[in-house]
Amino acid sequence: MNIFDFLRSRKKETTASIAKERLQIIVAHERGQRSQPDYLPALQQELVEVIRKYVNIESDQVQVALENQGSCSILELNITLPDR
Protein backbone atom coordinates (compact mmCIF):
# COMPACT_ATOMS: atom_id res chain seq x y z
CA MET A 1 0.00 0.00 0.00
CA ASN A 2 2.83 2.42 0.71
CA ILE A 3 4.22 2.00 -2.79
CA PHE A 4 0.90 3.02 -4.36
CA ASP A 5 0.62 6.09 -2.12
CA PHE A 6 4.16 7.04 -3.03
CA LEU A 7 3.47 6.76 -6.76
CA ARG A 8 0.21 8.72 -6.55
CA SER A 9 1.68 11.59 -4.54
CA ARG A 10 4.74 11.73 -6.75
CA LYS A 11 2.63 11.87 -9.91
CA LYS A 12 0.63 14.88 -8.65
CA GLU A 13 3.78 16.79 -7.75
CA THR A 14 5.39 15.90 -11.05
CA THR A 15 2.40 17.15 -13.03
CA ALA A 16 2.38 20.46 -11.16
CA SER A 17 6.12 20.92 -11.46
CA ILE A 18 6.02 20.11 -15.18
CA ALA A 19 3.24 22.66 -15.71
CA LYS A 20 5.19 25.26 -13.73
CA GLU A 21 8.35 24.57 -15.71
CA ARG A 22 6.49 24.84 -19.02
CA LEU A 23 4.94 28.13 -17.97
CA GLN A 24 8.35 29.50 -17.00
CA ILE A 25 9.71 28.50 -20.40
CA ILE A 26 6.80 30.21 -22.18
CA VAL A 27 7.22 33.41 -20.14
CA ALA A 28 10.97 33.46 -20.76
CA HIS A 29 10.39 32.93 -24.48
CA GLU A 30 7.82 35.74 -24.61
CA ARG A 31 10.22 38.10 -22.86
CA GLY A 32 12.96 37.16 -25.28
CA GLN A 33 10.70 37.84 -28.26
CA ARG A 34 10.16 41.45 -27.26
CA SER A 35 12.73 43.21 -29.36
CA GLN A 36 11.67 46.72 -28.47
CA PRO A 37 10.74 48.43 -25.23
CA ASP A 38 7.12 49.34 -24.54
CA TYR A 39 7.80 53.07 -24.85
CA LEU A 40 9.28 52.94 -28.36
CA PRO A 41 5.99 53.40 -30.34
CA ALA A 42 5.02 56.38 -28.16
CA LEU A 43 8.49 57.86 -28.62
CA GLN A 44 8.19 57.48 -32.38
CA GLN A 45 4.79 59.20 -32.40
CA GLU A 46 6.08 62.13 -30.35
CA LEU A 47 9.10 62.51 -32.62
CA VAL A 48 6.81 62.60 -35.66
CA GLU A 49 4.74 65.36 -34.04
CA VAL A 50 7.84 67.44 -33.26
CA ILE A 51 9.28 67.01 -36.76
CA ARG A 52 5.91 67.95 -38.31
CA LYS A 53 6.23 71.40 -36.72
CA TYR A 54 9.10 72.09 -39.12
CA VAL A 55 8.70 69.68 -42.06
CA ASN A 56 5.66 68.14 -43.75
CA ILE A 57 6.13 64.37 -43.32
CA GLU A 58 4.01 61.25 -42.89
CA SER A 59 4.24 58.89 -39.92
CA ASP A 60 5.70 56.08 -42.01
CA GLN A 61 8.65 58.29 -43.00
CA VAL A 62 10.11 58.07 -39.48
CA GLN A 63 11.64 54.83 -38.24
CA VAL A 64 12.96 54.34 -34.74
CA ALA A 65 15.07 51.34 -33.73
CA LEU A 66 16.76 50.42 -30.48
CA GLU A 67 19.83 48.22 -30.65
CA ASN A 68 21.67 46.72 -27.70
CA GLN A 69 25.42 46.23 -27.98
CA GLY A 70 26.83 44.85 -24.77
CA SER A 71 26.13 47.34 -22.01
CA CYS A 72 25.19 50.15 -24.44
CA SER A 73 21.85 50.86 -26.05
CA ILE A 74 21.79 52.70 -29.38
CA LEU A 75 18.70 54.59 -30.48
CA GLU A 76 18.63 54.90 -34.27
CA LEU A 77 16.33 57.43 -35.91
CA ASN A 78 15.79 57.47 -39.69
CA ILE A 79 13.71 60.24 -41.25
CA THR A 80 12.89 60.44 -44.93
CA LEU A 81 12.70 64.15 -45.68
CA PRO A 82 10.76 65.47 -48.68
CA ASP A 83 12.48 67.17 -51.60
CA ARG A 84 12.52 70.93 -51.43
From Swiss-Prot:
Pfam families, A to Z: MinE (PF03776)
Taxonomic superkingdom: Bacteria
Purpose of the protein: Prevents the cell division inhibition by proteins MinC and MinD at internal division sites while permitting inhibition at polar sites. This ensures cell division at the proper site by restricting the formation of a division septum at the midpoint of the long axis of the cell.
NCBIfam families tied to this protein: minE (TIGR01215), PRK00296.1 (NF001422), PRK13989.1 (NF010595)
Protein name: Cell division topological specificity factor
Entry keyword annotation includes Cell division: yes
Source organism phylogeny: Bacteria, Pseudomonadati, Pseudomonadota, Gammaproteobacteria, Pseudomonadales
GO biological process: cell division; regulation of division septum assembly
Annotated InterPro entries: MinE, MinE_sf
Keywords (A to Z) from UniProt: Cell cycle, Cell division
